[in-house]
Amino acid sequence: DSKSETVSPVPLPKSGPSQAHTEQALDMLRNAERPLAIAGGLIKGPECMAALTAFAETFDVPIASPQRRFHVFNSQHSHAAGRLPNRAPAPLLDLMKTTDLMLIIGDRGGPSMSQSFTFPRAPKPDHPLIHVWPDAQEIGRLWHPTLGIACDPEEFLKTMLAAGGGGKDRSGWVKELNDAHKNVMTWTPVSSNDGVVFGHVIQEIGKHLTENAVVTTDAGNFSSWPSQFLHLTQKNDFLGATVGAMGPGVPCAVAGGLSTPGRQVVAFCGDGGVMMTGNELATAVQYGVPLKLFIANNSAYGTIRMHQAKNFPGRVTATELRNPDFAAWGESFGAKGFLIQNESEVAETVAAAFKHDGAAVVETRISLNHISPSTTIEAIESS
């Protein structure tokens, strides 16, 4: 205990867009036929998220979400345009690239969101670009936007809404993108002879996920499965590193559970990442966080293995892993351990894990060949 005085966080000042910037943004938006907004991590809190939804509906603008920010817009909303993780699905990305106006709202922009600085292209985008970010020093650092607005994203959205909607009929464009997005998020079951394809597990988890669950993911190719197939709402939180740093999955889940008690907490980790910081499971058990930890175990550093297949086919070096029994490992911390070794065990095991009151660890022996939803190791090596 401490006798130090407890103080609340200092409220940060929020600035809105200038009248000139508002008028220019309105003019650009109302004249666009195929606008696309990318909403980033500064879209947070109920009011800001509600403003984003109202903006999408009022101006008839489809909304995409970047890597690890998939909760900022309801993935089942009619104006959902899809997700921009690392290596976004080509059919969806190609359609997005036909936009005639991009808006980046509440995201500074980086290699993941921009698909390695190709969307928007750096330094000069292929499309007119409006970039909304509070720090003026960030605007123009990577891209030369048509209009850069240094202001709070929530204030931008509310100012635009106060000015009213209007513009061209974009219902066809919105539906075209939304249909492509829904197609990408539709899982077509496949099987493999080297383990469970992780999509089967994701589909079952989706049936048990609450609308306000905290979802975290570690770094690795396994994360492409929940990133592509797990539906999220604005009441969820989706946490994880936006680039390739391994290890945040379990600590993020513990922090999410401790800071928002009473919410469902679901974490995804690969076997490599969970061996780095998974010991924080002890903290979850100690403080009663009912964490459900799903470990995708392919006995490899899967992402590095994918790059080896692409750049040095047939030359596997230092990516194979000798792993513990993760179900027993989880039980050693006081969690309930589960193991999935084939597809027939998925539904029952996932249901049992969610039914368990406390922390649970679910190890799935997944296919290494099915390295992501879009390709296999065999296909990469033969290409």
What name fits each language-model region?
Residues 147-157, 279-297, 373-378:
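A short alpha/beta connector and helix-capping loop motif
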Residues 15, 95-99, 148, 156, ...:
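Conserved thiamine diphosphate
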Residues 69-176, 350:
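Glycine-rich, acidic loop regions that bind phosphate or pyrophosphate groups
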Residues 1-31, 185-188:
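Conformationally flexible catalytic loops at phosphate/diphosphate-handling active centers
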Residues 1-16, 112-116, 343-383:
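Glycine/aspartate-rich loop-and-adjacent alpha/beta segment that forms the canonical ThDP
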Residues 178-260:
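Active-site diphosphate/adenylate-binding microenvironment
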Residues 21-35, 55, 95-99, 204-211, ...:
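Glycine-rich phosphate/diphosphate-binding loops that line cofactor/substrate pockets in enzymes
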Residues 91-111, 224-301:
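Thiamine diphosphate
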